[in-house]
Curated annotation (Swiss-Prot):
Coiled coil: none annotated. Interacts (when phosphorylated) with nbs1; promoting recruitment to DSBs. Its main location: nucleus. Endonuclease that cooperates with the MRN complex in processing meiotic and mitotic double-strand breaks by allowing the endonucleolytic removal of rec12 from the break sites and ensuring both resection and intrachromosomal association of the broken ends. Specifically promotes the endonuclease activity of the MRN complex to clear DNA ends containing protein adducts: recruited to DSBs by nbs1 following phosphorylation, and promotes the endonuclease of rad32 to clear protein-DNA adducts and generate clean double-strand break ends. The lineage of its organism: Eukaryota, Fungi, Dikarya, Ascomycota, Taphrinomycotina. Changing residue 114 to A: Lower levels of phosphorylation. Residues 54-108 are annotated as: Disordered. This is DNA endonuclease ctp1. The modification Phosphothreonine is found at residues 78-79, 89. It is an enzyme of class 3 (hydrolase). Residues 77-95 have a biased composition (Acidic residues). One of its GO terms (molecular function) is flap-structured DNA binding. The gene is ctp1. The modification Phosphoserine is found at residues 77, 87, 114, 151, 154-155, 165.
Length: 294
């Protein structure tokens, strides 16, 4: 068994040699295929050139055949026009054509005229000419206006303006354009309010300090001291609880007595203390000073 396995095994040098031979064969085959590709490309270029030359020849031959056919048709038409019956008689010169103008006028006799009546014996020298209606061509009247060529290209607005008087034309051209302007091209928005389309919005206060909060909610608000109110209190001094500002009313005037103390008077001592949801900004220094500058 060992001898059989030894015989089946192949040395690595033999395998290496076989692989080298295969690689050489592949390289030779690749070189052969590349040479075939080069030859095929050359043949393809030659065939394309031959096809282009054949196409140009066909185009030139077709153009020459068309030109020759047109010339033949023109020659046929000219020969048909020359072979008109009675053309030999036309070539003969008419002796009356070469006659002078005075001799031609002598053959025409002018009938006598009367001062009040129309021409007499007009049928003697005027021959009625009968022309078939089919041969008469109706000619359209041409526009004698110097701007007639431009009138076909003008707009409807300009045609309406031309029908007006010159004075109206001047006023219209000075006050308004020839055509209405488009608002979208001017970049101006249409600010006209549409009635009934806008819904009524709920009222929203413009200022933050307009809200009024009372009761227990007011106690929960943050307290702050206003320096301006405190300064006002210091300048005017505290108001005594026992004293009340005199008021000139009917009771004082008649009875001469003094009014009882007001229950809101102790609150004056707490001036400068505030409670608000949104604390306002402080007033700048010197805002309330009204002294005249020297």
């Amino acid at each position: 068994m060992n001898e059989e396995e030894h015989n089946k095994s192949v040395h690595w040098s033999i395998v290496y040699r076989q692989l080298g031979n295969l690689l050489e064969q592949y390289e030779v085959e690749i070189a052969r295929l590349k040479s075939q590709l080069v030859l095929e490309k050359k043949l393809r270029i030659q065939v394309e050139k031959e096809l282009e030359s054949v196409k140009t020849k066909q185009i030139s031959s077709s153009a020459s055949s068309k030109v020759s056919s047109n010339t033949i048709q023109e020659l046929d038409s000219t020969t048909d026009e020359d072979e008109i019956p009675g053309s030999d008689t036309v070539d003969e010169e008419d002796p009356s054509l070469n006659a002078p103008f005075s001799e031609k006028n002598q053959s025409v006799k002018i009938p006598p005229h009367s001062p009040t009546l129309p021409v007499q014996n007009a049928s003697a020298f005027v021959k009625p000419i009968s022309v078939p209606l089919g041969n008469v061509k109706e000619e359209k009247f041409l526009d004698t206006n110097p701007i007639g060529a431009e009138s076909f290209e003008s707009s409807d607005g300009e045609m309406h303006l031309r029908a007006r008087s010159p004075e109206d034309m001047i006023l219209l051209r000075e006050t308004q354009p020839l055509a209405p302007l488009d608002i979208n091209t001017l970049g101006v928005s249409d600010n006209r309010q549409k009635k009934g389309t806008e819904k009524k919005r709920p009222f929203e206060p413009e200022f933050l300090n307009d809200d009024v909060i009372r009761g227990n909610k007011r106690k929960a608000l943050p307290a702050y001291e206003c320096p301006d109110c405190q300064k006002f209190y210091e300048l005017h001094g505290p108001v005594k609880e026992s004293s009340v500002a005199p008021t000139w009313n009917d009771e004082n005037r008649l009875g001469g007595g003094s009014l009882p103390n007001c229950k809101h008077q102790p609150l004056v001592q707490k001036v400068g203390r505030h409670r608000k949801l949104n604390i306002p900004k402080p007033i700048p220094n010197g805002f309330w000073e009204s002294d005249f500058v020297d």
